[in-house]
Amino acid sequence: MKRFKNILYVADSSGIVLKAFHHAVDLAVRNDARLTVILAMERIPPYLTRLTPYLLQQARIEELEAALDKLIEWAASRMKIEAKIVEGKPFLEIVRDVLRNERDLVIKSTDHGDGAMDWLFTSTDMHLLRKCPCPVWLIKASEPAPIRRILACVDFNDPDSPDAATAETLNRMILEMAGALADVQGSECHIVHAWEAIGEQIMRSGHTAIDDEQTEAYIEQVRREHQGWLDRLLSQMRRWIGAETYDAVTPKTHMPKGNPSKVIPALARDLNIDLVVMGTVARTGVPGFLIGNTAESVLNRIRCSVLAVKPPDFVTPVSLED
């Protein structure tokens, strides 16, 4: 499946060929896509240096050009790459480039901690997750290549809710991307749907006339409804990505019961997942309501790379002008 045609890779000033750049080049080659490398530098206030602004700017540009040259040289035998240096707030300049050039994927390297706070998202990472209109792939520096295991997170939405169409579109995008990457990388493809029986805690509290048998029957009914929905979604996935691709990746489903922000990160750790594909939007069409509480909780608890997806009608609060 050739989904991506215009990829933007966010480089840093080191010039090191990171795993993220390997993935960017490989994906661009496989998709016959355009690949642009962008390096954003913050403006340095004049009062922080004794050098004239012009001399300092030239020194920094020369350093960044050398870093870009290393990346372009590494990839020269496989494809031609465009490169640019921009000055300003990095996330703003990256999102503006996406808007101006209609990018369909942003790839960036990130890093993790080793303690209880698993993710060490930079400020730029979080801004991109919240505000970039196209999918954002944040790649852990130690992620294996090729990717071994992918986890796609899908969510059930009440068909009568005003967000039902958006949820369906988002689920399709998530499954198509996960399926395509699993096919290309030869990865295991896992699909997770976390569910809860609303009202279970009250029913088990002993303060109602509902007995244990009725409670268990209710929970089982809810489980069957969610299982039926997930089964139907898999049938749709087969049509969306094609029977040949579907049979090649043979998705494995998981339906843990519990709070998604807890059970999804736990499952990702148990399965030793390398990449989580998930939606991040709480509401669409309203700038400012850009990332759901559950999504942010999941992002803060997982230890692997993330491909964050937003629906087509997402509206970024970033404008092309300051």
Predicted regions and their residues:
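Extreme N-terminal leader/targeting regions
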Residues: 40, 44-47, 51-65, 79-88, ...
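Gly/Ser-rich helix-loop-strand patches that form or flank binding pockets
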Residues: 3, 96-148, 266-318
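General small-molecule cofactor/ligand-binding pocket signal
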Residues: 36-38, 82-86, 137, 190-192, ...
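Small/aliphatic-rich secondary-structure junction motif
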Residues: 1-54, 149-216, 243, 301, ...
